């Protein structure tokens, strides 16, 4: 089975989605963004990428209009019905083992690791079988503190260094998994 990227698009900031879109397009990887609503930036990128793919097909001598119309981007936007964990459930059911999955959602990451997927978060860090229990525990502690009115420190907004860390880790992951940017 071909290598795929799966993105929990509800939890990944727009700037990082752009990095993922460009990498998937450049490497001609199948990449599926899953959310409970359509994301205009992803939809527009898919349209632009489809146009570029068709242009390349024409440049390589394809002339039949039906064949050209059949050429499409390998990037997809899947909109699931709204509901708790509906996007998560879809990703777990659909992503094959060995896929690269990108999410900020720790319980989803645990489910994907159990399935045999490679998982990274939106800050450029890998989720591993060795640290997922600790991350789940930290999440529960923070939730309990919030319920008591004690607010745990939140992550700041994504800055240029954060985007670079994410892009660098994506590059490393794709290289390790047999793809290069």
Please name every model-derived segment:
Residues 2-181:
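Nuclease catalytic cores that cleave nucleic-acid phosphodiester bonds
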């Amino acid at each position: 089975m071909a290598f795929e990227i799966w993105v929990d698009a509800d939890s990944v900031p727009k700037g990082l989605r752009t990095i993922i879109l460009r990498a998937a397009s450049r490497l001609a990887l199948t990449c599926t963004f899953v959310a409970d609503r359509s994301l205009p930036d992803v939809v527009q990128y898919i349209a632009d990428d489809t146009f570029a793919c068709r242009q390349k097909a024409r440049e390589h001598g394809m002339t039949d209009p039906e064949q050209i119309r059949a050429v499409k981007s390998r990037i997809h936007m899947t909109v699931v019905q709204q509901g708790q964990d509906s996007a998560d459930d879809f990703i777990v059911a659909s992503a094959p083992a060995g896929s690269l999955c990108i999410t900020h959602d720790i319980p989803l990451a645990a489910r994907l690791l159990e399935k045999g997927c490679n998982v990274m978060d939106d800050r450029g860090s890998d989720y591993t079988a060795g640290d997922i229990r600790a991350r789940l525990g930290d999440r529960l502690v923070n939730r309990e503190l919030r319920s008591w009115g004690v607010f745990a420190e939140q992550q700041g907004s994504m800055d240029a260094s954060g985007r670079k860390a994410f892009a660098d880790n994506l590059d490393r992951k794709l290289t390790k998994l047999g793809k290069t940017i």
